[in-house]
From Swiss-Prot:
Membrane-spanning segments: none
InterPro entries: AlgH-like
GO cellular component: cytosol
Family named by the database record: Belongs to the UPF0301 (AlgH) family.
Name of the protein described by the UniProt record: UPF0301 protein DP2218
Native organism: Desulfotalea psychrophila (strain LSv54 / DSM 12343)
Length: 190
């Protein structure tokens, strides 16, 4: 039986690109992919922050899985909340287990069986493995948006899966032709 939830919430599938006005230094230069957003709050994953101290092979071994591939992808810090929670953000394919279809092309799961499929693939360009997430209570994200902490742009699977991590922040903002390194949304009025 396929348990699929189609996410249709307002900012699900969008990027939150941190601006220079971001007051929380943990998110400076970060791109968050919003997976769920509704009246109860929001959940997102930082897509450009690999953890150099944690190897994917180590995580798999701790889960009791065999590791046969020599080259495995990075583990990303998806956010500061629940660093013991693991997620797979992936280009959609006919996975039958529990997952959320965020868009027609991008899905999210926490299932161990999906990890086994992912490890068997030849390309790590179809998924990100993340620990932790970014969470907002009801109304909290909206306040951050009003404070110009985030630039909201449509999510793009090429930015998530194909670009080097160091290019994702600028590339996501460039969707609107913005140079995020000089972007200042605080306007003066005469």
């Amino acid at each position: 039986m396929r348990n699929t939830i189609k996410s249709t919430n307002s900012l699900a599938g969008y990027f939150l690109v941190s601006t220079l006005q971001m007051p929380d230094s943990r998110f400076a230069g970060q791109v968050v992919y919003v997976c769920s957003h509704n009246s109860n709050g929001a959940l997102g994953l930082v897509i450009n922050k690999p953890d150099c101290n944690l190897s994917f092979a180590q995580v798999l071994r701790e889960m009791g899985m065999e590791v046969s591939r020599a080259e495995l992808p990075s583990v990303y810090i998806g956010g500061p909340v629940s660093l013991d929670a693991a997620f797979v953000l992936y280009r959609s394919h006919p996975y039958e287990g529990n997952h959320i279809d965020i868009t027609d092309n991008i899905s999210l799961s926490r299932e161990k069986e999906l990890l086994e499929l992912v490890v068997g693939e030849n390309s790590s360009r179809n998924y990100l493995f993340l620990v932790g997430y970014v969470g907002w209570e009801s109304g909290q994200l909206e306040l951050e948006l009003r404070d110009n902490s985030w630039l909201v742009v449509p999510g793009d699977e090429q930015v998530i899966f194909d670009l080097p991590d160091g290019e994702k922040w600028k590339a996501a903002a460039a969707y609107y032709g913005i140079d995020i390194t000089t972007f200042n949304e605080n306007l003066g009025y005469a």
